[in-house]
């Protein structure tokens, strides 16, 4: 008999993973600037490696931020507080190489092409996209968070791994770690069980592999994963190399923007390629991806589709998106053309419209930079609101 089961895998990483350190540092700097200058233009990139961090990018602002202080505070919060962890917030070197935003880019953002020859100074009309590009947003009704199950559980496990380190439950854990979850789907595309869980966690030198494996199951996996999803066939790989003492930036260099699939949908939906962290909301890589998630989530919550992927695309210096595309993968209750028309009517997808609609000039970005930008249960971001459901239902009647 033909077995129609399907497996799908996603991963997440802890806040102490080198690439995630870089994301959090970039977004901590962004927040520190936006706190005093909501209209700042920020493109902040971070590189971390043994004993040092390099902060580079383009920033135009009217405020002053003590960048080394922000970097050290962020590294301290993550947990790299002792030299023997391979990275120490107090003794690390911090290099900065910051320029202003290019005036060639600024003129297109400050005054969109459509309004350059007109006298409109209204910000929503005047602001152009900070770059060309394509962005995707996705939602599915397979979990209460409207996220695919594999990435949702991966984030929950990674967060739990960090929590038991920070609260002292497993005080031999160190900040670096990764999680991977493989979900089995039935022939109707419903998730039915967890096939495989992989956990790799940095640890102190004096703890045995057997203790780590036992403790991770007892304190991380079983309290996090619903018991009906685990059975005797579920496979667990916990620190499968046998040892993970050297970690963090000492083990691997980290870069801002190198975990874009972790940040979004775990590979379950398409990705336009642009990262989020370190970018102010005039950068549509970030703001339009948030808007696309907002649109997709409200469409699914309205019962208009079981799955929905939204693509937006922009031209640099132009306010209106050059295209809006919606794919419901055959689950739509109305046509995709109807959905596009409803979206055009009820969502302002110009850059300044998105910023206003989602209140994106707030200093909220550091908390997005670990454990996912979407479907979070510990914090409600503006793009996760379900306040367009009734409008969408009415629009397609």
Swiss-Prot record:
Sequence positions that bind ATP: 17, 176-178, 243-244, 252, 258-259, 279
InterPro entries: ADOMET_SYNTHASE_CS, S-AdoMet_synt_C, S-AdoMet_synt_central, S-AdoMet_synt_N, S-AdoMet_synthetase, S-AdoMet_synthetase_sfam
Native species: Staphylococcus aureus (strain NCTC 8325 / PS 47)
One Pfam short name: S-AdoMet_synt_M
Record-stated family: Belongs to the AdoMet synthase family.
Top-level taxon in the UniProt lineage: Bacteria
Positions of K(+) binding: 45
Protein name: S-adenosylmethionine synthase
Phylogenetic classification of the source organism: Bacteria, Bacillati, Bacillota, Bacilli, Bacillales
Positions of the UniProt region annotated as Flexible loop: 101-111
GO biological process: one-carbon metabolic process; S-adenosylmethionine biosynthetic process
Cofactor: how and how many bound: Binds 2 divalent ions per subunit.
PROSITE patterns reported for this sequence: ADOMET_SYNTHASE_1, ADOMET_SYNTHASE_2
Reactions listed under catalytic activity: L-methionine + ATP + H2O = S-adenosyl-L-methionine + phosphate + diphosphate
GO-annotated molecular function: ATP binding; magnesium ion binding; methionine adenosyltransferase activity
Obligatory cofactor(s): Mg(2+); K(+)
Subunit and partners: Homotetramer; dimer of dimers.
Gene expressing this chain: metK
